[in-house]
UniProtKB/Swiss-Prot annotation:
Classification via NCBIfam families: frr
GO molecular function, one term: ribosomal large subunit binding
GO BP annotation list: cytoplasmic translational termination
Listed GO CC annotations: cytosol
Protein name listed in UniProt: Ribosome-recycling factor
Subcellular location: Cytoplasm
HAMAP family, sorted: RRF
Alphabetical keyword list: Cytoplasm, Protein biosynthesis
Family: Belongs to the RRF family.
Length: 185
């Protein structure tokens, strides 16, 4: 029973970490990364469709993304979607390829992005701690129902805390990497 709780806790914390990584991957660093355009939705036959389903996005060089649209008729719609996104990008099309040059980040913008990333990291830690709280509640319920002893409860909570500490540390490591990436120019 306790092992199932630990496995479930580990799985849910991994999902929280992945969600955090996905959120900060969308933060622009000044380097061209295809994941930057992941959140863009293009109007396709009346419904918003993720850009990834309509085009191939690759980093052409350190400061340029190349978007190759599968359907020529969508070039203007894709260009408009990139332009109207809140990323501050200015795409230009050449044939079936749309080039998206990334303007250099100002020092002030870098600081703002670091604040955003730190906020995301805090949300990630909160999610991990919420998973810990749920696991501890399940363990306390087992104790209350007399399915485990107090010693087993204490041991299980210590193990859950170790798992939590590991994931909080991972969130901090990802945050440190992203901050370093933002400050490198």
């Amino acid at each position: 029973m306790i092992n199932e709780i630990k496995k479930d806790t580990q799985l849910r914390m991994e999902k929280s970490l992945e969600t955090f990584k996905n959120h900060i991957a969308k933060v622009r660093t000044g380097r061209a990364q295809p994941s930057l355009l992941d959140g863009i939705q293009v109007e396709y036959y009346g419904s918003p469709t993720p850009l990834r389903q309509l085009a191939n996005v690759v980093a052409e060089d350190a400061r340029t993304l190349a978007v190759t649209v599968f359907d020529r008729s969508l070039i203007s719609a894709v260009e408009k979607a990139i332009l109207t996104s809140d990323l501050g990008l200015n795409p230009s099309s050449a044939g079936t390829t749309i080039r998206v040059p990334l303007p250099p980040l100002t020092e002030e913008r870098r600081r703002d992005l670091i604040k955003i990333v730190k906020g995301e990291a805090e949300q990630g830690k909160i999610a991990v701690r919420n998973v810990r709280r749920d696991a501890n509640d399940q363990i306390k319920a087992l104790l209350k129902d007399k399915e485990i002893s107090e010693d087993e409860e204490r041991k299980a909570q210590d193990e859950i805390q170790k798992i939590t500490d590991t994931f909080v540390k991972k969130v901090d490591e990802v945050l440190a990497d992203k901050e370093k990436e933002l400050l490198d120019f």
